[in-house]
Amino acid sequence: MRFKSVFTLLPLLAQLPSGGASLPNNHGRVENCVRNHDGIHKFRHSNNTYQSMFPGVTWDEDQWVLTTSSLDQGHYQSRGSVANGYIGISVSSVGPFFELDLPVAGDVINGWPLYSRRQSFATISGFFDIQAETNGSNFPWMNQYGGESVISGVPHWSGLILDLGDDDYLDSTVDNVTLSDFKSSYDFKAGVLSWSYTWTPAGDKGSYAITYRLFANKLNVNQAVVDMEITPSQDGHATIVNVLDGYSAVRTDFVESQEDDGAIYSAVRPWGIPDVSAYFYANITGSKHVDLSSRRLIHGKPYVSANESSIAQAADVNFVANEKVRITKFVGAASTDAFPDPQATAKRAVSEALDAGYQRSLRSHVQEWASIMHEDSVDRYVNPTTGKLPDDDNIINSAIIAVANTYYLLQNTVGKNAIRAAQDAPLNVNSFSVGGLVSDSYAGLVFWDADVWMQPGLVASHPEAAQAVTNYRTKLYPQAKKNIETTYTGSKNATYIDPSAAIYPWTSGRFGNCTGTGACWDYQYHLNGDIGLSLIYQWVVSGDTNTFREKHFPIYDSVAALYGSIVERNGSYWTLTNMTDPDEYANHIDAGGFTMPMISETLEYANQFRQQFGLEPNETWTEISENVLVLRENGVTLEYTTMNGTAAVKQADIVLVTYPLVYDNYTAETALTDLDYYANRQSADGPAMTWAIFSIAAGAVSPSGCSAYTYHQYSYAPYARAPFFQLSEQMLDNASINGGTHPAYPFLTGHGGANQVVLFGYLGLRLLPDDAIHIEPNLPPQIPYVKYRTFYWRGWPISAQSNYTHTVLQRSQSAPLDTADRRFANTSIPVFVGLADNATLHHLPPHGPLTVRNREIGTINTIEDNLIQCSPVSSTDAFEQGQFPISVVDGATSTRWQPSSSNASAVTVNLGSTTGRSVQTVASGFHFDWAAAPPVNASVIFHDTPLSDPVAALSSPGPHVRIVANLTNIEQSGPYDPEATDLNEIKIPVGNTTRIELAQEVPVGRYATLVISGNQALAQADGEDHVGATVAEWAILGPKSGSPRRRIQPVPLL
């Protein structure tokens, strides 16, 4: 039964500020960040610090700082990533050094299509080469038509080495036994990565307190800074070595390197591009004990690779015991793609940084980050009254990833202030590669990842930064039109293609032509519609109708012309043959279940825009749009015509029809059926971004429960890596057990997906090209409160906040965009709340709030009389990746808890006052859905205090512990029968269930614990410990006379 909250709107409205959200105090933030990193003051953590999901890693919620005391050398997952949208670099876990990976399970290989060695990477925006082929390909025979264009590296520019002589030096290979008091922090407010520790090399050379700080200047994007402090324990002599290491300059030809006015520089050009080069200059300053006059080039050192583009310069240092020595390295960089004279630009950049010095450089950098990524630009979970995060590990980690997602995406964009500072150089025009500027995973190519996964969440809150995506597609539009001439390379060679059409390749680098990795024809045609969606989003958030009409609508119309040309009649329907949907496990199929709706929507919108801009609609497009072929079986939308029930799915496909497509000819009932079916068919070896879409779709179409919250955790937690919450492409990084994938890292696609959940899921925002805001708020009960990041609609900033029952919208006090639609300057904005076929119209006034009711499906029971749905859950037992304990109470059978051990494992539900439910109620029975792998035995324990060892409590209950149910040799309600089961049939799976009716009602304690053991899905019990059983849902049934109404006391909205 849906709970009707006793919460009234009057207190909520009384606490709202009349003028909108308060502006962030950027001055105080800047001063605090500068103080923390100026090298004069000691870094001070706030009192609002929490333990993260990773041992030894803490999170400072007030300052947005991750700090680790754990050192993991030689592994790509622990490397820090630093970028400013123009230059980027990955550095070792022990300092700003170049690093080669150490083998794990014999593997040091990055993935398709390069299959190159894992190592630190550095590059500069747009630095793509041209080469005949790559080690992997989709259509290798296509290389005869022009070859590939993949990202090239540049010299690794951040190295600053302390060399004591006699082979004692500090770089990425330092022996960790010589290090103590290790800490490394990533300050996301300051944009500074830092390290501190004591290095005590073997012998009698004393010890050295070391601090490093690294940042790529966010305002002056041609500049970067490395700051080093050394405090020796005894007198001595050493050298400081300024290194530009050519080992990371992969796929380049050497141009030149030498000293120049005290600085050193190295220049390279990408393979096959003779008129493009990148120059990197580096110079150092030092405190009084650093002899800058002694600077000289050195060779043959083990920390400087023998690559031709490597160059290193040493300076002498005289140590005095306990006196700090400080060395600051300034870097200047430029390439021909953005600057006509890259050498002069890079030299000027390093000189200007040197003149500015560390403090002014740091301040300008921090100020720019504060203006771009202010407090209101990130989803916040802190209680508005206490300023603290809830005492819930999932929410704490969600708060961390909310900041990390935004930061890692933004550090791959260039803001308008930086563009202005660079005299309007073409800087924000190269979109996002899968790994950004710090990785050559997926060859640094641009995929649909940028348009569908990274752009939507970013463009809503940072429209100007996100222009990188649409600017890139606009830049390559002429080539996309030329690609139409290449139909001879595919099965459409005899098809008439409208000359106004355009087609983009699946992968894209410098040129945007059709290649072996980036086919145009007979592959993922949906990409072109994906690009169309990103153009619409940019328009809706910016209000810039002129840019859309003049630059983006022509692209959109060309995509419509493409779709109108390549479909063909199939009876009374239109279909597309020899294509691939987003699910790349099924290639060269017909009538893709996502692509066909994408074609329909694209054609419909194209005609709508034509009318809006005074052009004649295309009647054929209308006819096609209304009659695309979409096949269903047992209510499930098929991915392709020959699909059967054995098909596993690589990544989000049909679920994309619900969001982001928002397909008109698609009911909520069908969307729910598709959600439940494909959640069960999703491969565990699929990439990270998938589950974000399941979360958003579940929030939109599920009639009950809180699986959206489970999927939210699934969207990032199994993929996050210590220490800095960068996401991997895979849940398991070992290619020998994850289906053979060498995961991309960092996987910005995953960050982009997770970055959409809160705004498009919990708020239910949809960026539709009309004159209204569209939302459908539905905050899970586990989250007491969320303040959504400020989002833009038609150029106007909108703030929103939710508790469980209500959502408040109002115009933010932040300035509107320069492109804001002036029609809404002083008038109300229409707001539709709910699904399109059942939406309610509201109006957001120019001043003051709009309050709307949430869906509140978390308190609608999936299983009647369930007392514990969406209650707090905990477990101390290890569980399989993504198979969270919270799954057992989320009201959905498509999510599951699966402990890693088939020995006894326990999950505990808190029925106490945190959920507003009285603990005086009684239980009349239990319902279990075991999914496909029931346990052998199970027990239910009621208790009033937490149990340190629930398994031990089974044999020794104690005075406040009641064993309420014992199930042994659990009978399967639906055992697998190979004779009767048609594996080819497409239908939603039904799990094994058990229902227990108690002889008499039993009082429920504050806690209830389920203990399971064994796994009936295993072939046989051989005495070994295997993976545990599955629990899809556990319900405690309330009194037979009717369970008490669940009450959730909402957090007041300020």
From Swiss-Prot:
The active site is at E584 (proton donor). Substrate binds at W448, D449, K650, Q651. It catalyses: alpha,alpha-trehalose + H2O = alpha-D-glucose + beta-D-glucose. Its EC number is 3.2.1.28. Residues 1-21 form the signal peptide. Glycans are attached at residues 47, 135, 176, 283, 307, 493, 513, 570, 578, 618, 644, 665, 734, 803, 826, 838, 903, 937, 966, 992. InterPro entries: 6-hairpin_glycosidase_sf, 6hp_glycosidase-like_sf, Gal_mutarotase_sf_dom, Glyco_hydro_65_M, Glyco_hydro_65_N, Glyco_hydro_65_N_sf. This is Acid trehalase. It comes from Emericella nidulans (strain FGSC A4 / ATCC 38163 / CBS 112.46 / NRRL 194 / M139) (Aspergillus nidulans).
